[in-house]
Amino acid sequence: RSKATTFGTGELIKDALEKGCREFIIGIGGSATNDAGTGMLSALGYIFLDENGNELEPNGENLINIKSFKDDKVMKEVSEAKFLIACDVDNPFYGTNGAAHVYGKQKGATSDIIKILDDGMRNFSNVIEKIKKTDISNISGSGAAGGLGGAFTAFFNSELKPGIDIITEKIELENKINGSDYVITGEGRIDFQSAMGKTPSGVAKLAKKYGIPVIAIGGSVDDEIGNIYDCGITAAFSIIDSPMTLGEAMDTKNAQRLVEKTAEQIFRLIKQNKKN
């Protein structure tokens, strides 16, 4: 929400730096924050100021008031570190597809708060461009985790890379996919965001190179998913088989049963098609 902060993330990085860590892989996403990373930056020594030079509390609400920042108290270790940022979405910093508009509602923000946050993100982006000569406004993934992706890009020696790319390289997924008959992927909720750099689309793009059908399984499947087919997903199925609460659906034993049941039905159909 408007007062939520990434300060705790900064504290974790600070602790790791103090213990000698200089190479980081940080996964961003699924956050409850929309402060453009100012909380994290504050924990590492950055100070944000309003037009009168007064220090501001780092949160989403104050983004609109930031006119400058000071970095003379930033930990020297920050400049020695390299950050590989695992980012599964490609949203820009602000705007219609930016952090506030796409993820604000999910985090409990009303339409009025979303406007405040988006205007603040735009202002902070302009301040960054003016002082650091870096335009993060349309960098793919800069809007991830409420703008945390943009903060890493502008203030640190960092690289934003899809989390799926990091994982696929580590486990050599493309080699495993090549030669398969079918590929199964999925996530909790399959919706239009699934095609925006998230794991299902990353897997599907690899499979598409070899003409392999991709089946996505999710806890729920939204109505507006036409874009997922463009990235290579053949079909998507929800595992829910009867009315149930979210808690029941997420229960570990229940979820496992539902996934197995759905997978069995999918492959029964595939098996029958092969017979025909």
Residue ranges and their predicted role:
Residues 1-28, 32-276:
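N-terminal loops that bind phosphate or other acidic moieties
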